[in-house]
Amino acid sequence: MNEILLFLLSLAGAFVLRVCGFGFGVFTMAWLPYLLPSYGEATTLSGILAMAGSILVAFKNWRKIDWYKLTPILITFIVSSCASIHFVSVADDHLLKRILGVMLIIASLWFLAISKHVKVKPTLPVQITMGTISGVMGGLFAMHGPAAVLYFLACAKDKDEYVVLTMTYLLLGNIMMLGFRIHNGFLTPAVGHAFLYGIFAVAIGTWVGSKVFHRLSTDVVKKISYAYIAISGVLSLVMS
């Protein structure tokens, strides 16, 4: 395993997560499947590191959480992610990498083009739909943020509430998925070894990202996020 590359990936992923409110898995999963023995172990590592990156923000601002906006989509996510995690344990790694690449590109095109013209209202059907998509993408690719972001952007009253909603959603979702991944045998010594290198990078990236977050407008944050989603998708397809 290339420990230096792992450190840099974790650093950049944590930075993006803190600035954008999502994206750790989107960024790191373009590379982690090639650094870990199996795809399932890669998703496990990505989920644990993302959980570490979101825990401080979620706990620090827990009083600002509007649970009415969070609970329905979170419950739907939990249900839909279970089957997806089981699928990872029996699916071909190369197939999953190709699917991941396509999903990343589709997600980036959605955010760059369609989301400018389609307004998402924070209704129960929207929460169920976004929660289902988020669960599938989280279980398969450790990137359950993009689908949920559309919902949180629509219902959050400001940038600060948006970030605390997404961070709490990612934290609780990753805790749940970690249990299922342990059950499927994806928490291995290789994951533990990689975590020791990644956790320090996550701490640094989160700290730097918190400084940048307060200086950027929401529009700039969105554009940066959409661009790297597309790049990650292309890289995943090329390297699969």
Identify the meaning behind each predicted range:
Residues 3, 7-71, 135, 143-202:
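Small-residue-rich hydrophobic segments that form or flank transmembrane alpha-helices
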Residues 3, 47, 101-104, 108, ...:
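Residues within membrane-spanning alpha-helices of integral membrane proteins
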Residues 54-62, 90, 97-124, 210-211, ...:
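Transmembrane helix exit motif
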Residues 66-77, 99-103, 122-131, 161-168, ...:
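Cytoplasmic-side transmembrane-helix entry/capping segments in multi-pass membrane proteins
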Residues 85-95, 118-119, 181-193:
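Membrane-interface helix termini and inter-helical loops of multi-pass transporters
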Residues 86-88, 137-144, 177-180, 231-240:
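Hydrophobic alpha-helical transmembrane segments in multi-pass integral membrane proteins
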Residues 106-164:
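Membrane-embedded helical hairpins/re-entrant loop segments and their flanking transmembrane helices
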